[in-house]
Amino acid sequence: MIFKSYILEENFQSINNCKLFLFYGENLGLKKEFKEKLRTQNKIQEILNLFQDEIIKNKNVLINEVSNKSLFNEKKIIFINQVNDKILDIVDEVIENMQDERIFLFSDILDKKSKLRSYFEKSKSCGIAACYQDNEITIRKIIMKKLNGYQGLTAQVTNLIIQNTGLDRDKVNNEIDKIISCFKDKKIDLEKIDLLLNDL
């Protein structure tokens, strides 16, 4: 089942019905945000972080994690990083044994011919979301949303942030964190922000 990443940003709860979910694409910052939302949303659950290479070397790593129930937590969340088509057979095998576990896969760009991408797009029980590179419009929305209520947030300040981050969501978030730390009174000073942002 295909989900649009911009809709997930607004309504992240919509993925709760999927036992398996694949995030793919070149936008590392967006995938990082989704991972953080999953961690926040599932604080009381055990969260495991695995990589495809370790699972390919020993598929029992994943199979055991799915079959073994935790003594402390009812549910388990598993992140599998840097996946590609090589993991498809293992995922297909594991999904049959899943009960309360949820698995989230993270991949770089997958072309339309990708078997993994096709599997997730056609499945009714799995979800998939493309994380495409941000453009100036999406970056502006992020800045406006996170700095909402700040006096002095002008087009000039927004443009300065965009120029200094090169449309990289991770860098934008870091710069916004700096601004929030520096301007605790929520009054942005253009001279100070220029110095702050050029201090990369």
Outline where the language-model segments fall:
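Conserved beta/loop motifs at nucleotide-recognition and modification sites
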Residues: 1-200
